[in-house]
Amino acid sequence: MAKVPPGLDRYRLIMDLSFVTQRMPAGMALNEIRIGSRSDPEIRDAVMPMMSAISEDYVRLVSRIACEAGLKPTRELHGLTGTVAMATRALAINTFTYPSPRVGENVAWTLQTMREDLIARQLGPNKARHPPPLAEKD
């Protein structure tokens, strides 16, 4: 991230890196805590302040990077940030037991398209870099 100057490329990169960070040991550990807290009220009560702070810090980071790129921190941008985080979290967890590259490609393409649609709406179509259509495979 530090090698990419502020702007749309950095914003695109942080969104694309979400899946990578979810698959890192620290990301997987956080996911395991999230999953464990669903059925254990004591764990949930113990980790909720920390997990909430991590989530809020992430939203602030992405919002700052988005603002540096000229984007407005609207509800749509926050919704996209949450969607990317939740989708890549689920993808990181699920691909350990269902390692289908096609699922990952489909999800990544959809998230990138949503991101570029937001960029086009806020900054104009000339700023968007939509991914090429996915090749249909049998």
List PLM regions with ranges.
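Hydrophobic alpha-helical connector segments
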Residues: 1-27, 77-84
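Residues in soluble alpha-helical coiled-coils and helical-bundle/repeat scaffolds
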Residues: 2-5, 38, 42
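Hydrophobic core segments within long, regular secondary-structure runs in both alpha-
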Residues: 11-15, 55, 107-115
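Amphipathic alpha-helical packing segments from all-alpha helical-bundle domains
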Residues: 22-31, 41-68, 79, 105-109
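Hydrophobic/aromatic-rich alpha-helical bundle segments in the mid-to-C-terminal region
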Residues: 44, 65-137
